[in-house]
Amino acid sequence: DVKVLQAIAYALNKEEFCQFAFISEDYAEPADSLFTPDTLYYAKPDNTYDNDPAKAQQLLSEAGKTSLSLNLMYISTDKTMESEALYVQSALANVGITVNLVPTDESTFKNKTKDPECTDYDLVLSFYTLGEEPSLYADMCSSDSRSNYSRIKDTDLDALWEKGNSTADETERSDIYKEIQNTINDNMYIYTIAYSNGFYAVNKDFGGFDECLLKTIYYDYSKIYTLEK
């Protein structure tokens, strides 16, 4: 029920969430879209679901779901996920939703999330690194994808992904990907938590790291050079 998903979003506070899970804004900032800000055609969705527990309770009442119990699965060895799970459990309890934590080893986690028949979880914590090309994000949200952990079934959204990938006009592509981001957000298919920052240790004997494009996926090591002493 979309109202239940929206209620969950309103029950959470992203700033508080990030502080609880990542300790400091130096390590992560609240996310507002499936796309990261450096992804092509990133656009902040129209509805940001600002924290509103009263609105969350209203939506749950409208959906007839005032006494929910949900299973939240996450990787047991990931300390950030563990902190996130505890925050979700606490925040949703404030609006009357019981969250049962399901810590799982990484191998089992991968098997269960990729099994479309698995019913062991209602909510799942995950992370992704997909780079600047927006079409890559379709793998997380397409009806038939094995990486569709949220079990999204939306033929209109599937069509938008296909259209965005086959359209050459830049303006039209931008409009399509904005619609995709709004569709995911409006239906609260995926609640994006944070854009985490990457940190790198470098040797002072070398230079060129600024030109190396220090991103999680893309590097150009040819830009790195030895500094003369």
Region roles according to the model:
Residues 2-3, 11-12, 47-54, 78-86, ...:
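Soluble non-cytosolic domains of exported or imported proteins
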Residues 3-6, 18, 100-109, 137-204, ...:
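Extracytoplasmic/peripheral linker and loop segments enriched in polar/acidic and small residues
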Residues 61-130:
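Ligand/substrate-recognition segments at binding pockets and active sites
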Residues 200-229:
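Long beta-strand-rich cores associated with HINT superfamily self-processing modules
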